[in-house]
Amino acid sequence: MLVYNKDNAKEILENKVVFVDFWAPWCGPCRALGPIFEDLSEKYSESAVFAKCNVDDDERFARKHGIASIPCIICFVNGEETDRSLGFLPQEEIELFIQRNI
């Protein structure tokens, strides 16, 4: 799992399809989503790149992406945001979100 931050954002977004999980360690729903995102990143590793961004590590960078609440998964295609999923969702719904964006 890649770490997404201001230092490597351009490099990561050069991939065709990228899913970034914006999270924080103190966020209960984020901690619940973490293992689901990890499992799905392994399942769909051939189709997309998966990364995580701890919003506490760089709040300004998170705000640049319009992150107002977490967890939030953003899908980027060719460097442009195309979709986002906000809040905790069950694995089936996160998987549908991924499938419709790859």
Where is each model-derived feature located?
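Non-catalytic, surface beta->alpha helical segment in thiol-disulfide oxidoreductase systems
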Residues: 75-102
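Conserved redox-active cysteine motifs that mediate thiol-disulfide chemistry
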Residues: 22-36
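Thiol-based oxidoreductase modules, predominantly thioredoxin-like and allied folds used
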Residues: 3-4, 22, 37-41, 45-60
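Structural micro-motif
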Residues: 59, 65-74
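Conserved hydrophobic/aromatic "anchor" residues
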Residues: 9, 22-23, 50, 76
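Short active-site neighborhood of thiol/selenol oxidoreductases, capturing the structured segment around
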Residues: 13-23
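N-terminal "domain-start" segment that seeds a small globular fold
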Residues: 1-11
